[in-house]
Amino acid sequence: MGLLDRAGARLTGRPKEAEVLVVNTCSFIDTAKQESVDTILEMARLKTSGSAKKLIVAGCLVERYRDEIRKSIPEVDAVVGTGELEAILEAAGVAPAPAPASPFNILSGTSSAITLHGKESLAGTHKHEEIAFRAEGDLRERQGRFSREEWQGAAHMLPTYLYDESTPRFLTTPRSSAYVKIAEGCDHPCSFCVIPNLRGKFRSRRFESVVAEVQQLVARGVQEITLIGQDTTCYGEDLGLKDGLALLLDALASIEGLRWLRFLYAYPNRITGRLLETIAKHDNICKYLDVPLQHASPDVLKRMKRGAGADIFLKTLEKVRTAVPGIALRTSFIVGFPGESPSDFQILEEFISEARFDWLGVFNYSDEEGSGAFLLDAKVPKRTIDSRQRRLMKLQQSISKRAKQQWVGRELVLLAEGESEETPMLWEGRTQFHAPEIDGKVYINDFGELESLEAGRFYKAEITEAHEYDVIARVVSGPL
């Protein structure tokens, strides 16, 4: 959208008004594919009856079903894969605008800009002198990843695109928050996952590029940054950086005006002591960690090509909670993976009871063509999968309610997000223990001495009531 906006296209969220319809798709699991296809068909019908002259399909679905989309849906005029971002302009019939000077060049003369191209660039950078560069090239430990040999023959077909700080962005998030992608692709060969086929080999953005983009966003008024990637904890390893994510967090946390900084999707065996120390020492790094574990049974995890098990995970969680007291932990699991026996499920159930996650998601196994698990036998019946999913969510509901009850009486800083969708009598907000969009909500029913609140501002509030996933709060002071 940023490229289209910079080129002069007028963007609208109302499909009936558009001359060019763009459907950005996902194809990670069956439900995402179905939603994408349904939306494409809906836009195809709109194209034939409305003012739209072109229909473009973009994103992951194109990487998996490019030819099928073209053949099956003749209303589609163009397809744009995940590695073909620039092609959106030609597909939409929009002339590209001249690229402005790199925002990083503007920042390069300031003390807050960090340039790390090699060892020689570290001269005079006292704060970051501990950064250790390895030899050129990808020297990461195997850690269950695809080897160079396994990528041979496929690399030329995989996406390689990686945006940088000069790529124009059109923010669709609330004005106070933004996501920043620090890496693309994944090298982990998880047998249930097709992301490596859709997104390509793991590749990190340049350190200084991420810093520059966050500086730009904060200068525009963004106060909360969420770092994302398919595997954020491996950030920088392909660039030769050791503890790259910890170093990046250290640098970003020093940016004046950044109130909250968090990252999502930590691979469990990449959570280092240095990373935890960094989270603990900065007040503006949210005490929040999202670690998708996928299962707890060693047998299931082995078939998933992930390894470890409940005992190892419990030790990891203990290490995290000791290093960062009060941290909120989120995870996700897959039920119904091929071969998941009743005893495997029992191991998972008992692990969840003992681990006591603050937030938890349970996904039904999706049998994806092209994944390693697609070829496995001993498929679990859908009825059994649904039953197991409901059982785990009921268990987590009770765990979550007990955890939220511990919040009652505490005063926490929250970000006000606006009137509740349920009723204008309530406002919604989040604490540092809530990631955007995926966790519960804080409902504000008492503004204290204030007549009104302002979306995008921070307030101190007392938690007065707890439910399974949500809490009720009254404002004590602010805006902060």
Locate each region found by the language model:
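Conserved, mostly hydrophobic/aromatic
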Residues: 190, 210, 227, 263, ...
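Proteins enriched for Cys/Gly/acidic motifs involved in redox and nucleic-acid/cofactor modification
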Residues: 1-235, 274, 289, 311-322, ...
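Short flexible coil/turn linkers enriched for glycine and charged/polar residues
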Residues: 163, 173-176, 186-188, 219, ...
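Short acidic/polar active-site loop segments enriched in Thr and Asp
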Residues: 77, 223, 259, 358, ...
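Conserved SAM/AdoMet-binding glycine-rich loop
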Residues: 55-57, 64, 219-345, 353-354
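Radical SAM enzyme [4Fe-4S]-AdoMet core and its adjacent flexible, acidic
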Residues: 236-257, 303-307, 367-398
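Generic beta-strand/beta-sheet core signal
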Residues: 195-196, 228-230, 264-266, 292-294, ...
